[in-house]
Regions:
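Short, basic, low-complexity termini and linkers enriched in Ser/Thr/Gly/Pro
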Residues: 8, 238-240
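Short, solvent-exposed helix-loop connector elements
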Residues: 32-35, 242-246
């Protein structure tokens, strides 16, 4: 289940970070077709499966064509396997397409073509893991739930702990941190994509994908610069990092005095 114990670390700047990221998100978020309430829950799930290990910019045309051809679970469930593989195109890992079709068949037959609305039911669907179930709960249904992927782990670790996240699967401490800093939702926010927890999940993920990247982070463009626990600096020449000429794995990480 998506549940963790609370971390031991005292977090003092979570509200300030959330406010800064929300402002940045509303001004700078990429206008992807499944965002801002424009896609069905099924469409959101399709986008999440397609985006696994694939850049979102590559996903958009495939998602548009896919949803026009198979707009719901019933349509995909009835499709020929060869057509499904062909439509997946160059997204990579075609097994994902077949698992998505298996998922569609379960949704069509067991849930009357409506995506289930609980985390446990989503997790039980073919090909759906913790991240995808949590993402659908947040992005499609507006539920307050911590979403944890590689980008979110990296951002939260850098911003709140002043260190890099470890590789591999998310640790219990990382999941606990994600749960601890998740904003409370405002009952007055009726639209699911406006709820603070949803904006938080999407903005942290977006920051990790576009600014707080793994190897060449754009610290000077970070909306939480001055709040975050550390930035990445080159001992002598920051410009080479900004131009992508220096691998951050070979750069000294500096905890910025006065930020935390």
């Amino acid at each position: 289940m998506n549940d963790t114990n609370e971390p031991n670390t005292e977090i003092e700047n979570a509200e300030a970070v959330a406010d800064a990221l929300a402002e940045w998100w509303h001004a700078s978020a990429r206008d992807l077709p499944w965002r801002f309430g424009r896609a069905t829950p099924w469409g959101v799930l399709v986008s999440e499966v397609m985006s696994q290990q694939t850049q979102m910019s590559r996903v958009v045309p495939y998602w548009n064509d896919w949803m026009e051809r198979w707009p719901d679970a019933v349509a995909l469930a009835d499709a020929a396997k060869a057509d499904v593989i062909t439509a997946w195109g160059r997204l990579g890992y075609p097994r994902r397409a077949l698992r998505l079709q298996e998922c569609a068949r379960v949704v069509a037959s067991d849930y009357d073509n409506k995506l289930p609305r609980t985390y446990d039911e989503l997790l039980a669907l073919p090909g759906i893991g913790d991240y995808t179930a949590s993402a659908v709960m947040s992005f499609a249904f507006g539920e307050r739930i911590a979403v944890v992927d590689t980008n979110i782990r990296r951002v939260l670790s850098r911003v709140f702990l002043g260190k890099e996240s470890l590789g591999g699967a998310a640790s219990p401490a990382e999941r606990a941190l994600a749960k601890q800093v998740l904003p409370q939702d405002d009952a007055s926010k009726c639209r699911r994509f406006d709820r603070p927890s949803v904006v938080w999940n999407q903005s942290v993920m977006e920051l990790g994908a576009t600014v707080c990247t793994a190897k060449v982070p754009l610290c000077e463009a970070c909306p939480v610069l001055g709040i975050a626990c550390f930035c990445i600096m080159v001992v002598r020449d920051w410009g080479n990092v900004a131009r992508g000429r220096v691998n951050v794995s070979k750069v000294r990480i500096v905890r910025c005095v006065g930020w935390c």
